From Swiss-Prot:
The gene is panD. This is Aspartate 1-decarboxylase. Belongs to the PanD family. It is found in: Cytoplasm. The modification Pyruvic acid (Ser) is found at S25. Catalyzes the pyruvoyl-dependent decarboxylation of aspartate to produce beta-alanine. Its cofactor is pyruvate. One of its GO terms (molecular function) is aspartate 1-decarboxylase activity. PANTHER family: ASPARTATE 1-DECARBOXYLASE.
Length: 128
């Protein structure tokens, strides 16, 4: 059996560009793509923390070290500059990979979209 699992996540990145008339996609700083194990043309889901929008597109390379998160084409209508988004990619993982200890790549960024940390699990949510 295969399970559809979270593979990659860039958490709370700020939208830096909205390019309505650019060919559709999301340009992501190449440093972030590599850290999150997302490749060019891979399908990604984007969840806008500010307005609740959730949509899918594909990743393209943004300038390395720029902090770029550019929503292009129709995706540009789903956010405003400065909105915080979660960018996620999923993969089909078989039971053997899961038993062998497969983990996702989770990347956390600062207010300039520079990497401030990473981990391979989502912590248990507790009541506080």
């Amino acid at each position: 059996m295969q399970r559809h699992m979270l593979k990659s996540k860039i958490h709370r990145a700020a939208v830096t560009h909205c390019e309505l008339h650019y060919e559709g996609s999301c340009a992501i700083d190449e440093d972030l793509l590599e850290a999150a194990n997302i490749v060019e043309n891979e399908r990604i889901d984007i969840w806008n923390i500010n307005n609740g929008e959730r949509f899918s597109t594909y990743a393209i390379k943004g300038e390395r070290g720029s902090g770029m998160i550019s929503l292009n084409g129709s995706a540009a209508r789903r956010a405003q500059l400065g909105d915080l988004v979660i960018i996620a990619a999923f993969a089909m993982i078989d039971e053997e990979e899961l038993k062998a200890g497969w983990k996702p790549d989770l990347v956390f960024v600062d207010e300039g979209n520079k990497i401030k940390g990473s981990r391979d699990h989502v912590p248990t949510q507790n009541w506080t």
